[in-house]
Amino acid sequence: MKTKRFLSLFIAVVLCLSSFTAFAEEIVMEYSPFDEYVDYSNMYFWSRWNNGDDKPADLFFVCPTVDMGKEGNYNAYITDEKYRESFDGATNMELGIYDDATRVYAPYYRQATFPVYSLSKEEQEKYLSAAYEDVKKAFLYFADRTDATRPLILAGFSQGADMIIRLMKDLFDEPQYQRRLVAAYPIGWKVTEDEV
């Protein structure tokens, strides 16, 4: 009798554990870059912060797509060192035209990876919107901690340009941001007449 009860209990535990293991594997497989916590008050999450103290304007720059990704990996892992190196390299290439006149602020963000652009527009939007949430969070941190009287330039290339356009649509109806803005350069992305 005890053996039967023990065997029944053992089988029940094994079944529960195997179900939990299958569930846990599903969770692990669905781990995403968005399981990582991003805190823009930590300078680790900025590629550039206030580089150029004596410059007359502030530049909020959003890097282009640099993560080649893999099938099923549609947003970059912000803590991945290879991603950060590629991100810094691309950012440095783009900033040459701004360096003489601006303090540079460039956040790392969990950008959409190249495979995203092979998805349907609806699917793309999930990953691009997720990337935008990082950019918005970084911009709000930047705006709260920089001099509101300094001229502001927004710039981005490719996906970075898309993020700049989204930022302007989302936040730049507000006077505190409008007053600062002197130029926006969303280069390498479609800008409609309505968006101008």
Describe every region a protein language model picked out:
Residues 62-151:
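Active-site catalytic motif of lipid deacylating hydrolases and related acyltransferases
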Residues 156-160, 164:
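Gly/Ala-rich beta-loop-alpha elbow adjacent to hydrolase catalytic centers
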